[in-house]
């Protein structure tokens, strides 16, 4: 499992996100 804090963060690319979160299609990290 990826380590991804449950914080809503807007993003344009994966590097905008914390830890191992990825930028999802709806424009938020997850």
UniProtKB/Swiss-Prot annotation:
Signal peptide: none
Molecular function, one GO term: serine-type endopeptidase inhibitor activity
Subcellular location(s) of the protein: Secreted
Disulphide connectivity of cysteines: 4-21, 11-23, 17-29
Domain of life: Eukaryota
CC per GO annotation: extracellular region
InterPro entries on file: Prot_inh_squash, Proteinase_amylase_inhib_sf
Site (Reactive bond): 6-7
UniProt keywords, alphabetically: Disulfide bond, Knottin, Protease inhibitor, Secreted, Serine protease inhibitor
Name of a matching Pfam family: Squash
Job of this protein: Strongly inhibits trypsin, weakly inhibits chymotrypsin.
Family: Belongs to the protease inhibitor I7 (squash-type serine protease inhibitor) family.
Free-text note regarding domains: The presence of a 'disulfide through disulfide knot' structurally defines this protein as a knottin.
Protein name as it appears in the record: Trypsin inhibitor 7
Lineage, top ranks: Eukaryota, Viridiplantae, Streptophyta, Embryophyta, Tracheophyta
